Amino acid sequence: MRIAIMTDSYLPTRDGVVTAVMTLSKSLRDLGHTVFIIAPDPGEAHRESGVYYFPAMKFKKYPEYYLPIFPSGKRKLIESLNVDIIHIHGIAFMALKGLIVSRSTGVPSVATYCTNVVDTMEFYSPLPMPTEIQGRLAWIYMRNFLKRPSCIIGSTPATLTEFEENGVRPKRTAVIPVGIDIQRFRLGLDGSEIRKRHGFTDEKVVIHVGRVSYEKNIGVTIKSAKYLPDDVRIMIVGKGPAFQDMKDLVKEEGLEDKVIYTGFVPDDELALYYSASDVVVSASRFETQGLTITEAMACGLPAACSDGRSFLDVVEDGVNGFFFKDTPEECAEAIMKCLANKDRIAPLARKTAEEYSMEATGKKMIALYESVVSDVKTS
């Protein structure tokens, strides 16, 4: 098949959407399909060969993101690619462009719901109005947007449940998680060099991976260090708009010896960082899947996660990890349970991750594409 992936965010931005696009495009190409990535233009210095770009400008509230200029004269470019299906990632400007091209060409579109937009309003919205009102307006927009593609894809069942609760009525839905490379993220990797690099000897290491942003609730993870034994360290991997504020919080809480920040870590080292650790943690209630949790599980790590949204579909309490509520004390308790049960949980965590292999999810996606294309042709 010839597949156009239109995404609201792409490299050099690093987030779950970008990872999802990169992973999906690789899995589809490995299966013998042709994939075209279409993204906002980050400027000449950051362009990648083989990616089609729409003119864009930086988003002032979050300068790591780029907003495509609307309208633009690039629609004919997409039409010239002669694709069988358009796969939209996001609900903003690139997504709207995808719908316009789909309608003008008759090429069916599907959309992956990647981001819980309402949860970001408090932190990044440029609109001068109460967050509650913005949230209601966002759901009005999403109810209108999400009924237009031929199918809406959620990474977990929790996403589709949230649609139902907020009156979203897509034409069709499917649950297909973002895949992971289970050959790259695996048991038995040697993380000793990473431990040495960051000054760890016999300490237990709890890792948090992802954008350091306000909606990720990282403050709970940081404060949990106060309730952990002296030989436990929290390692926060990644950067983002809350990076400096979270570093300041560590200092304010007097936790400089127990919480370390690595900043951005290259993709080719990430699996080693997981393997250098003992537990993966996330206090976020924002995730549509929690991709880094699955990656860590593939490396045998038990997961200490908040008991909300998509984590409920990935983590089984007491089997491959432990849940906690919203307090630092409860987070610390879940971490200690993970540490105490690490050897028992490691193979179970790996077994969970294997269900999310790139190959398996890529095949599911192709089957969905073929079904959607067939339905459109016969309708």
Language model segments and positions:
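Donor nucleotide-sugar binding/catalytic pocket of nucleotide-sugar-dependent glycosyltransferases
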Residues: Y53-P55, E132-G135, W139-L189, F200
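A conserved mid-protein helix/loop that constitutes part of the nucleotide-sugar donor-binding site
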Residues: T19, K204-Y227, P241-K247
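N-terminal subdomain of nucleotide-sugar transferases
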Residues: M1-A56, I366
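Aromatic "clamp/platform" in nucleotide-sugar-dependent glycosyltransferases that forms part
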Residues: R285
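Conserved acidic donor-binding segment of nucleotide-sugar-dependent glycosyltransferases
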Residues: D317-G318, F322-P328, M336-K342
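Short alpha-helical donor nucleotide-sugar binding micro-motif in glycosyltransferases
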Residues: L146, F264-V265, L272-S277
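Nucleotide-activated donor-binding/catalytic signature segment of Leloir-type glycosyltransferases, i.e.
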Residues: D245-V265
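Short hydrophobic beta-strand element within catalytic cores of glycosyltransferases
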Residues: P302-C305
